[in-house]
Amino acid sequence: MADGEVHKLRDIIEKELLEARRVFFSEPVTEKSASDAIKKLWYLELKDPGKPIVFVINSPGGSVDAGFAVWDQIKMLTSPVTTVVTGLAASMGSVLSLCAAPGRRFATPHSRIMIHQPSIGGPITGQATDLDIHAREILKTKARIIDVYVEATNQPRDIIEKAIDRDMWMTANEAKDFGLLDGILFSFNDL
């Protein structure tokens, strides 16, 4: 298949998925991927306000700020959003899986969910004052993420703090038992 045919096929698939009100987030959380998802979500909202949207997530996580941009936009929609994890929802991907209202958060049977505290990648340089500013900011970010998990799971704050101290990997069933999911989805017809 030539490159032009591949792009045409991708466009057809994307169009069909949007017509079915399915938005797929199958990549790391970046400014670009967040922007693309937000545009699709708002396209569907403007096209038919209040009609349900399914947000399918398969993401290793990524940028906290980009992820919370998607989160905030989903919360602003009048269309009810159902999240479905398929494959992996790790780090910020797991936070995105919680942006749906209670009762609308699902995963496919073989999905995995990983929660942890935020981290800063790469070498950090600067004056002691700058490092102190970064440390305070990451602690604020950690508190925001803990708030999301506490609200979503109804777990006590100390349980969440302990859970995210290191990477906590869960199967779909374990994530459901922990309160991160409302159910295991065996068919999209069940939505």
UniProtKB/Swiss-Prot annotation:
Record localization: Cytoplasm
PROSITE patterns: CLP_PROTEASE_HIS
Cysteines joined through disulfide linkages: none
Keywords of the record: Cytoplasm, Hydrolase, Protease, Serine protease
Keyword Hydrolase: yes
Protein's GO biological process: protein quality control for misfolded or incompletely synthesized proteins
Keyword Transport: no
Superkingdom, natural source: Bacteria
EC number: 3.4.21.92
Broad class of where this protein is predominantly found: cytoplasm
Entries under SUPFAM superfamilies matching the protein: ClpP/crotonase
Catalytic activity, as annotated: Hydrolysis of proteins to small peptides in the presence of ATP and magnesium. alpha-casein is the usual test substrate. In the absence of ATP, only oligopeptides shorter than five residues are hydrolyzed (such as succinyl-Leu-Tyr-|-NHMec, and Leu-Tyr-Leu-|-Tyr-Trp, in which cleavage of the -Tyr-|-Leu- and -Tyr-|-Trp bonds also occurs)
Pfam families (alphabetical): CLP_protease
Family affiliation: Belongs to the peptidase S14 family.
PANTHER family: ATP-DEPENDENT CLP PROTEASE PROTEOLYTIC SUBUNIT (PTHR10381), ATP-DEPENDENT CLP PROTEASE PROTEOLYTIC SUBUNIT, MITOCHONDRIAL (PTHR10381:SF11)
Function noted in UniProt: Cleaves peptides in various proteins in a process that requires ATP hydrolysis. Has a chymotrypsin-like activity. Plays a major role in the degradation of misfolded proteins.
Subunit structure: Fourteen ClpP subunits assemble into 2 heptameric rings which stack back to back to give a disk-like structure with a central cavity, resembling the structure of eukaryotic proteasomes.
Protein name as it appears in the record: ATP-dependent Clp protease proteolytic subunit 1
